[in-house]
């Protein structure tokens, strides 16, 4: 498969690479190389054209608490321990209900996707069924976790 577009990425923290109007060759979900022209044997069904777009890598979040999604924006006036006691621990107790967990985790994952985060290392709760739901939803939505 080939993706045509304008690619922007950083091979190192002090280096920016721009590949304008090029093709990325993708094998098994991995970019194997870039080229300015397609091989002659390439059929149109193997090319996805984003030539009017800028393509950047997805973001990776290495430390995120999925159940705290429902706490976002709450308790800015609290120190850590009171915040945990007033907001986090009561909220995380609700994840004993798998229906509640599925609803929250679905919203959480959709938000990550919308912001370009497609890979993460997440903390869940002590509730085994709800934690499995998070991982199953993430896999079904195409995340790497």
For each feature predicted by the language model, list its residue ranges.
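Flexible loop residues that form catalytic
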Residues: 11, 65, 125
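Short C-terminal domain-edge/linker segments immediately following a structured domain
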Residues: 32-39, 64, 78-79, 89-93
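Hydrophobic faces of well-ordered beta-strands that scaffold small-molecule active sites
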Residues: 58-62, 120-122, 145
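Alpha-helical scaffold segments that flank or form the walls of functional sites
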Residues: 25, 72-123, 127-143
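Residues that scaffold the ATP/ADP-binding catalytic core of kinase and kinase-like folds
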Residues: 11, 34, 69-70, 83
